[in-house]
Amino acid sequence: MSDSKFLAETTGDWQSMDDFLRHLADRPASSFLLPHASPQETAAILSAHYAEYQKELFFAADAACTNELSLFGQTFAYSDEIDWQSDPVTKWHWPILYRESLNAFVGSTRPVDLIFFWELNRHQHFISLGIAYWLTGEQRYVSAFIRQVKNWIKTNPVQHGMNWYYPLEISIRIIAWTMAFQFFRGSPEFQQEAGGEFMKSLWQQIDFLSCHLQSVRSKDDVPNNHMIAELTGLILAGIAFPEFNTAHKWRDVGLNLLVEQVTAQTHLDGVNKEQATGYHRFVSELLLLVVMQSRRGSLKPQPILEATLEKMLNYILFSTAPTGTNQMWGDSDYGRALGLGQKKDFWDFRPLLSAGTVLFNRPDWKFVSGRFDEEAFWILGHEGMDHWKRIASRIPEQTSCAFPQGGHFVIRDSWSADSDTAFLRSGKFGLGGEGHCAHAHSDLLSFSLWLQGQPLLVDSGTYIYHGPLRDYFRSSCAHNTVMVDGHNQAAPNPNFNWRHVLNARCLNWSADHVSGIFNYRGVEFIRTLRRTGSGNWTLDDRFAGEGTHEIDWFFNFAPGLDFDLRENDRILFVTRAGSPFLKLHLPDGDFDFELQLGWYSNQYGLKQRTQKLYAQWRGRLLEDGTLFHWSFEADQIKSVSQRGEYAAAV
């Protein structure tokens, strides 16, 4: 793309690319996306309040200068140039073909997983390099950025190669490039050596994205988080670069479609319809970026987006476990909108509550989030920090909460850090229904349980989107639910989507119990989970149907526990760190019980062995239902107290 052709796509009368770049460099910082104008002021706040984060930021930026990158907690080092076309894990090289010729490589028979490859090419480490340069003025950060971005542009010709295949990935990269540009734009070295190439490539990616949104790619597609991410990238690009002729279209069309999609993809109670909590986080982060621009006056007021975001964050509030982490329902590729807190546990969603505290003046969110997180600081700036300090923390009025449209139910005895808390799912299988539900798992009427603030029963997670263990992690046996006659609750398609989808619904709920129901091939299953006292819970499973059936139960335990199964006594003893933790009383009847090895993954691409209790019953169901009773009894009964912080450990 020539300079003249590029400048023809702008609204000004710039005579050269140098003039255009100087114009962007001279624009006030307030006209870009992050509300930070003074590196000295920001550096002082980081040193005073976020010293450990600041250390990690510079460590990551220094490593990136030597082509060493951290992806999902794993380090990948490149001795020469970064290989943008190869999977970092297997080194499998994607061909540089026209994007539509790559369809054959991307289906269910593709040779490797794509997530590490895409994470590498999202370029969120460019933001760290930019911040490090902006704070220090050290040229090595600029030099590394120039070297890497020029190499990427050279090795990724327009519409060729896997980095032009998925518009979602292009959108996240656009956001990262736009944020990084805010910090590099004043560098003479950047302007002279890479500025023109950078801006041309950025425009080409935005232009491509505007013509390849998810909703127009296929009539069979069900728009999901991809569409929301794509629209967010368009909107933010339109805000950051009003100099482009079509910037107003990117912004306005993107905004109209975003309101439409957010409304369509979110239940009225704030639960994301994909039934995948990791994508609930991802979408919340994207909406936060857009709502923040509205609050800053870069967009007109967005009451629908604000109301939806507040409800989504309220779901996060109640889905936060005593350990400070959220639930791992459904799939997750561990993607983040900005990646400003990569070192933190992905499942700690409290940074979102931290920002939401300020945006929506929520003292209860401040209580649970505990601190004004560094991610919130970057997005909301110094004024956001001042606002946070003025809000008085308050314990949430409710302990338990139901999200009936989303089908999520929370039972909690207190907001203390040693609370007993249960989370149960009883609702729609996923987004799109039959043949879709791409990121849902076979987990209806599954539940997770924390006793005395510690995890007991957990969701197994996702692990990976490719390979033989993909189906294990999304199957019923990886969740704390049941299988009828040896079948998953739905039939998985390769890698994504489900057939023969069923749904569950809630029968009744109160602050200390919940009952849900689904029907699988003529067998009605009703599960009732009840808190009967401090450290004590009961689980009643009732099955009704005709004929003889086989019922399988799965209880997937958290890592770090030990077990003693005494089948004759119908008790499973659970210990933690050598101390008694729980007695699980098993049902009477003709059962087979067995402790089996399971898997647990709370980071993409990493897994560890855990144990699970497997139980099987075979017999003829009674006409009015056959009841199986389980009870959980904590060995050390706590004294419930309202502590000053919820899940104080960060």
Model regions and ranges:
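Extended, charge-enriched "interface" segments that sit outside catalytic cores
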Residues: S2-S108, I115-E119
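Acidic-aromatic substrate-binding/catalytic surfaces of carbohydrate-active enzymes
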Residues: L7, S31-Q40, L444-H466, R470-A491
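Structured loops at beta-to-helix junctions and adjacent beta-edge loops in soluble globular domains
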Residues: A37-S38, A63, T75-A77, Q85-V89, ...
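Beta-sandwich/jelly-roll carbohydrate-recognition scaffolds of carbohydrate-active enzymes
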Residues: D83-D87, K91, E397-S400, G407, ...
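Aromatic-lined, polymer-binding surfaces characteristic
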Residues: W94-G107, P111-E310, N314-T325
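Extracellular structured ligand-interaction cores
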Residues: I115, L120-R122, G406-H408, L444-S446, ...
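CBM-like, beta-strand-rich accessory domains located in the C-terminal region of large
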Residues: S171, A337-D345, V358-F372, F377-W378, ...
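Carbohydrate-active enzyme catalytic cores, enriched for enzymes
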Residues: V271, Q275-L457, N508-H513
